[in-house]
Amino acid sequence: MKNEEENIIHRVQAGILSWYGFGLDSSVLYIGDKEPVYEYLQQLAHEEKIHEVCLVSPENLSEICLSGRKYDYVISIAALEKIKDVRSVLKEMYSVLSGDGHLLLGMNNRFGIRYFCGDRDKYTHRNFDGIENYRRAYSKVEDTFCGCMYSLEEIKRMLQAAGWHKDDISSYSVFSGLDYPQYIFAEEYMPNEDLVNRIRPKYGYPETVFLEEDHLYSGLIENGMFHKMANAYLLDCSHVHNDSRPVLEVSNSLERLQDHAFSTIISRDTVSKKAYQKEANDSLKILESNTNLLESRNIPVVTGKYHEQNGLGVFSTKLIQADTARSVITNAAEESSDKFYELMDLFMKELENSSETEMMSETEADRALKKLSALGMNARESADMKKMLMTHKVLKKGLFDFVPINSFFVDRQFLMFDQEFLIEDLPLDVMKWRVTASVY
């Protein structure tokens, strides 16, 4: 029985594929060990959301080839990096796939931005070995092979040598990496927002890191280097081509407790939040309710509908192609202080209009003081704090995510989205501080 911490780690690592739409009658061959992604697939099979999943090591894949068995999906996450003859295994993987099947391959990138920031190589545990293509690590006969990473072009060449045409291969860039797949971007898609407040870098050796990776993303995007320097890739190979790729971006919120764990999936014209397990269905129903609440108060909001697919909750909205309010406000600050203050004032007015407000009652002030008791205030300080609290407004139904990063700016209006958390009697000044902090 896993504890909650182990469950969270399991969910986070399974996020590399938990958003993917497998068919109910799918047969899956997983190549690797009994790791979180395989356990997730086992869970799908147990819940009859796929037909079956089989496990085999790369070394024993040839036995499957000899049996003549074919699978709808062949999946491997980083396992091929630990073997020398990757090309032979890729050919075997190709041979056990059904004609219209999919190969899903997770691979680390030796040119990942994390390694330029000082993180050590995943396999040699030394700095810059992958960037140098392991010329110092495996140049001598006596050197022991521990594993190695590849660049995107190297991976694609090996896949083509295994039998795939270049048009059969779709790639997704993974940040922060395969161990923490928080964001997944289609290769032809560029994020239209500053990711510094979105992606949280994770490192194998944080003590050797000397650059802040998250502050480099915008420069990589601007100079066309974002995908080439992704920390990892998910490759989806199939002979069946869609006219347009259905998924452009995935953001996972799986480090949360089970009842709030879901993935946000952006396609060409829709955005869908999908529950990781049915325990998160209620949180998506609340999201719909909060959206309707804002709409009822004439606050511009991206409206959506809740439904279920195979027992899992999904909240879907249309895709809005616009800059986030945070980007607009920070850009305004660079142009003119007057423009910046004008936008901030406009947002603060919308915040106050988002809920009925009233002055904090004595009971509410006492409750707030109790939470502040850890500050060690004396009697006079407590009395002053209580007086101050009772002269400040509270939002009767405050939305904790009512901040510029969860808003678009369209036609001189703030258009809110992703309003997950409602807190009754939320002090207005707390939210004003959150709004200000989210901009800076």
Regions found by a protein language model. Give the residues of each.
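Conserved alpha-helix/loop element of class I SAM-dependent methyltransferases that forms part
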Residues: 6-26
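Hydrophobic beta-strand segment of the Class I
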Residues: 74-75
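A short glycine-rich, Lys/Arg-flanked "PGG" loop and its adjoining helix->strand segment in the class I
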Residues: 87-102
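Conserved class I S-adenosyl-L-methionine
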Residues: 105-129
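Catalytic activation segment of kinase domains across protein kinase-like and atypical kinase folds
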Residues: 124, 129, 381-440
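Acceptor-substrate binding/catalytic loop of class I
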Residues: 137-157
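Conserved catalytic loop of SAM-dependent methyltransferase domains
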Residues: 168-207
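Conserved ATP-binding subdomain of kinase catalytic cores across diverse folds
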Residues: 241-378
